[in-house]
Curated annotation (Swiss-Prot):
Belongs to the cytochrome c oxidase subunit 3 family. Component of the cytochrome c oxidase, the last enzyme in the mitochondrial electron transport chain which drives oxidative phosphorylation. The respiratory chain contains 3 multisubunit complexes succinate dehydrogenase (complex II, CII), ubiquinol-cytochrome c oxidoreductase (cytochrome b-c1 complex, complex III, CIII) and cytochrome c oxidase (complex IV, CIV), that cooperate to transfer electrons derived from NADH and succinate to molecular oxygen, creating an electrochemical gradient over the inner membrane that drives transmembrane transport and the ATP synthase. It is a multi-pass membrane protein. This is Cytochrome c oxidase subunit 3. Signal peptide: none annotated. Its EC number is 7.1.1.9. It comes from the Eukaryota. The chain crosses the membrane at residues 21-41, 45-65, 90-110, 138-160, 167-187, 205-225, 247-267. GO terms for molecular function: cytochrome-c oxidase activity. Keywords: Membrane, Mitochondrion, Mitochondrion inner membrane, Translocase, Transmembrane, Transmembrane helix. It is found in: Mitochondrion inner membrane. Component of the cytochrome c oxidase (complex IV, CIV), a multisubunit enzyme composed of a catalytic core of 3 subunits and several supernumerary subunits. The complex exists as a monomer or a dimer and forms supercomplexes (SCs) in the inner mitochondrial membrane with ubiquinol-cytochrome c oxidoreductase (cytochrome b-c1 complex, complex III, CIII). GO terms for cellular component: mitochondrial inner membrane.
Length: 269
């Protein structure tokens, strides 16, 4: 039933979602991923096969779920103004939760850095740790992220003004900038002289920057999907909730990275 047909019988503007298997499948695949990862890390299972299987099921089911959401928004007209307001509110709460997670990681970092224990040698970084220099890859990544914030803003404003060509160009450049950031971060990790198991410094460093790295991988995927949708005329100047939330997400990650760079790379060294 299309939105126009439903409006004759429905006295409220909200979308009644049809029965879907994806929420329960995603939930169980997330549970399976967490359990298999914990079992593999503690040596209860000898390989990562269950982890990769759970990750494959999670990725596949999430992709199919978002496919249905795109169909409801683009082709069925189910995302009314009231629904879009609800989506924006939900995304805002998601951003708040992300900020609180990183606030906890910064707290852990400052707790260890401002009063290093005797076991750490009484200094920060601890004795034996060769910290990543802030003027090398981290500085390049900072410049890349600031540039991506500018290009995605240019693309967003071009879309609002109906300039599809510039919107596509800006989004294409932004997507590749984020991909380059992810590659540079991976190179930094592979060349670092310490690991996540090297005491509290390694743990909190990789917990903070690694969580941001995973979010950047997810952001690159979101940008690529929005580029595909924009090329296929899914997004208009007045209806582009998915793209708008992605832009906000990028700016939030930009700000978090600036704090990570200042605290973890510059002040912490």
């Amino acid at each position: 039933m299309t939105h126009l047909e439903r409006s004759r019988h429905q006295q409220f503007p909200f979308h009644l979602v049809a029965p879907s298997p994806w929420p329960i499948v995603v939930s169980f695949s997330l549970l399976s991923l967490a359990l298999s990862l914990a079992l593999a890390m503690h040596g209860y299972i000898g390989n990562m096969n269950l982890v990769w299987l759970a990750l494959f099921v999670l990725t596949s089911s999430a992709t199919l779920w978002f496919r249905d959401i795109i169909a409801e928004a683009t082709y069925l007209g189910d995302h009314t103004i009231a629904v879009r307001k609800g989506i924006n509110l939900g995304f805002l709460l998601f951003v708040v939760s992300e900020v609180l997670i990183f606030a906890g990681l910064f707290w852990a970092y400052f707790h260890s850095a401002m009063s290093p224990t005797i076991e750490l040698g009484g200094v920060w970084p601890p004795v034996g740790i060769e910290a990543v220099q802030p003027t090398e890859l981290p500085l390049l990544n900072t410049i890349i992220l600031l540039a991506s914030g500018a290009t995605v803003t240019y693309s967003h404003h071009a879309l609002i003004q109906g300039n599809r060509k510039d919107a596509l160009s800006g989004l294409f450049i932004t997507t590749w900038l984020i991909i380059i950031f992810v590659i540079c971060q991976y190179i930094e990790y592979t060349n670092a002289t310490f690991t996540i198991s090297d005491g509290v410094y390694g743990s909190v460093f990789y917990a903070g920057t690694g969580l941001h790295f995973l979010h950047m991988v997810m952001l690159a995927t979101m940008l690529a999907i929005n580029y595909w949708r924009l090329r296929n005329y899914h997004l208009t100047s007045s209806h582009h909730v998915g793209y708008e939330t992605t832009v906000i997400y990028l700016h939030v990650l930009d700000i978090i990275w600036l704090f990570l760079y200042i605290v973890f790379y510059w002040w912490g060294v």
